[in-house]
Each structure stands twice: as C-alpha cells, then as structure tokens.
Regions:
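Zinc-dependent metallohydrolase catalytic domains
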Residues: 1-113
Length: 113
C-alpha cells in the first residue's frame, strides 16, 4: 500500500506539473493548424500518452515494497493514473464517461489551483 503521507508533496507536484505542462502545450498550438491524428490518436491524446509513457515501470515486487517504504514519489502507475483522473482535459481527450475504468466523479476530483 502506498504511504500517502510520504508521497503527498510529490503527488501535488505531479498534479500541478501536469496542469501547467498541458496548458503550455495548448499555448504552443495557438495560431497553428490542429495536427492530424497519428495512429488514430489526436494531438491531445498523444500529449497524455506521452505523460503516461514517461512513468512506465517494470519492477519486481520486492522493489515495489522497498520504494513504497522510502520513496516520496508514488509508483509510476499511480503517478499517471491518479494525476490523469483528476484533470478535466484528460476526460475530454479520451471521451471518458461514468462507468469507464478511469472515471472519477467531478466532486471527487482534486482541485488545488
């Protein structure tokens, strides 16, 4: 189990960093044509897929246990899923609706800034 007290600061940083990065990405597109989909994914979907790819991990159970005890960062899976589930643009990009595995009710989503 994750230690929320240990990872709280980094979880907040991941959330804020993702919001800022997404806004910077949108700002970079202003005045430009919308890029064509690649492999069936829109530019905004590719932004979120890139974020998810950044934190991909393949680690052994004993390393998971070790990191959970000492690392102030959540494991990659949770850095991705927890951050994405809390921001509205992710829902819009992938048309996520109630009943989908990544859905979280708007009232339950973290809003810090």
């Amino acid at each position: 189990h994750a230690n929320g007290s240990l990872t709280l600061g980094e979880n907040i940083a991941d959330h804020g960093g993702l919001l800022v990065a997404h806004q910077a990405y949108l700002n970079s597109l202003k005045g430009k044509e919308t890029p064509a989909p690649i492999d069936g994914f829109t530019n905004e979907q590719r932004f979120f897929l890139g974020y998810a790819t950044l934190w991909g991990q393949n680690i052994r159970p004993e390393e998971i246990r070790r990191r959970t005890k000492i690392d102030p960062h959540s494991l990659g899976k949770w850095r991705v899923n927890a951050a994405l589930r809390n921001i509205a643009p992710f829902y819009a990009a992938f048309d996520i609706k109630e009943g989908d595995p990544m859905f979280m009710a708007p009232a339950d989503r973290v809003v810090i800034w």
